[in-house]
Amino acid sequence: MEIILLLFLLQIKHCYADFVIQTYKQTVHKGIYRDPIGISHSVDHVWTSMIALLVFSFFYAINPFTIIWLCFAEGILHYHIDFVKVKFGSKDQTKPIFWAQFGLDQLAHQVTYLVMAIFLLNL
């Protein structure tokens, strides 16, 4: 049951960071490596992951340092997944390849959350 709660919290935070608070500028600048505006989107994922894991830690003990480094690792990975998609992916939303690449991007993020959950539940 723990994994369901953890994945649920990570899904909520992902939806919020990717689809609610992400700005147009962030979507464009994610394709410029080390651009502060593009990086800010990944920072949004770091702090929303921290909140999700802090909520989870009310029910299941997690070392605070583990939360910090795991969230920063997720932010770095999120940044690079998005960079590759924006830099090398299709920009034309009318083409099926755009949506296939968008789906692969989202799958990569979901696999990241699954790995995070498996790691945390096997400490």
Predicted regions and their residues:
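Hydrophobic alpha-helical transmembrane segments
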Residues: M1-S90, T94-K95, W99-L123
